[in-house]
């Protein structure tokens, strides 16, 4: 062929030149030099439109369709056309729901191999996409782009440094985006991947390099699912019906809390926080410990009848210590410790007196006029009467019932009626919080247990909260209603059932309910079920597969305030 031949003739000559002879025109001399160095005949063809050099006629035919717009491969189902036959073949998998690529670790299936490769990064700690501003790494390019859009270091980029070097920034962007290109030896993939029990601590990341082949991935999955593999500790148990977080959890307190006196230092620090907060906090602690003692087989009565180590006689204390040395431990009882019933009544009276009177060392602390002279069991040998901490009838005036009288002369009798308040300490919690917010002495707060089915006052079950929760479907639902009185007249009150507190001011109640979006945050918007706490609410959403919806209800209607 002559040197003045057309370009088409040159292309045909190049394509048909299977012996690898040099082209006389010299236009592709550089490409032929590449063929000579690599030892392969690539049959290079140059595009006239954009100058792209294609490796073969088939590559050139596919590339030229991008300029002409030709799409010869068309789907006969939906009519979508493609430039290559392989794209049409992959498109047919959409209509047939065929997913030939499956993850060897989980049940994920996909239609494309590159999607499977991207999914495998979830099971490993490989993060090949790195931010160019702050060097944070991500597993997907989309996550990295979203981060770069709002990266705080755009104006002042931070140059990351590879591990093992100080003050040596990356030289190019390719190394920054590829963590596998960091300097240093790569760990060997022949060693088995560590199981969860071999990790240093809970939450530690696995090694950054995944196993090399599928067999090692399957072996890792088998080790993780083995019965002997260690797992994370279970979440803390939340007992329903007790005060605490959302009114349904109770802190673990030592069994001697009921016998602890009213501390002077704690009262001084609490007075600075506000008024009757120390007294209310002490009552909460005593009531919470009373619930724990009531759940034991012996009940609260046995726990109150057991004297402390400091109040036991020297003979009983020495005999108990000698029994411990010999390996035999005897439990304290009224007969073994030789404590008289009158001493028990005096101890109980002192405990109840500490609930309503301050410590003797705090006489200089200013108190309201009605609390300057509380009852003291040390000054008076036989006090007239004392109010019981029964939240079913908790009033601040001097009108009491004869059944709720405890004296130091009569023995302490724990009847079924007196045990009824232990499972419903949440009502006492709301009452105590109302006492804290109220500074007037002529306001009476009463708590009534109402039966919703009969709409009348009924007796409360004396079982423990754990027993009541087991038979919740068989028993009737009990509701606590709070009434606030001032000078004999009933006041309007607003109650937040989520936080277990009442408000005497409507504006304060509206501001507080704005935190909960004027709705109950523990009620499912899909089925209407109300959960006891946040943990049960999240478990309900997961197990029932509800779609989260943002529903904002209207605020509650205001009642007429006198």
UniProtKB/Swiss-Prot annotation:
Chain spans, region Disordered: 178-210, 293-342, 361-404, 451-473
Principal location listed in the UniProt entry: nucleus
Low complexity compositional bias, start-end: 307-326
Tissue expression pattern: Expression is strongest in the anterior Fol cells of the oikoplastic epithelium.
Gene3D superfamilies: Classic Zinc Finger
A single cellular component GO annotation: nucleus
Stated family: Belongs to the Ikaros C2H2-type zinc-finger protein family.
Protein known as: Ikaros family zinc finger protein
Source organism of this protein record: Oikopleura dioica
